[in-house]
Amino acid sequence: MSRSGQPPDLKKYMDKKLQIKLNANRMVTGTLRGFDQFMNLVVDNTVEVNGNDKTDIGMVVIRGNSIVTVEALEPVGRSS
């Protein structure tokens, strides 16, 4: 959540493939399906990436406080 108390503006990332870096040197890729004001994410078709190993873990909820960065892996339009 931003410092101003506003919820994150992730609408433009909905249904887009993302790479999400998490604490403890973890990383996942998947399609964003939902989020809330605490930046908890619902990610579908999720793959956990650990070096050269990739593990399909399906649909997951990622707590916002464990997210370090979010990067789009496909073009993202502007939110309205």
Swiss-Prot record:
Keyword Transcription: no
GO BP: any one term: mRNA splicing, via spliceosome
Domain Sm, residue spans: 5-76
GO molecular-function term, one example from the UniProt record: mRNA binding
One Pfam family linked to the record: LSM
Localisation per UniProt entry: Nucleus
Keywords recorded for this protein, A-Z: mRNA processing, mRNA splicing, Nucleus, Ribonucleoprotein, RNA-binding, Spliceosome
GO cellular component: spliceosomal complex; vacuole
Keyword Nucleus included in the entry's annotation: yes
Protein family per UniProt: Belongs to the snRNP Sm proteins family.
Biological function: Probable common Sm protein, is found in U1 and U2 snRNPs and may be part of the spliceosome.
Protein name, per record: Probable small nuclear ribonucleoprotein G
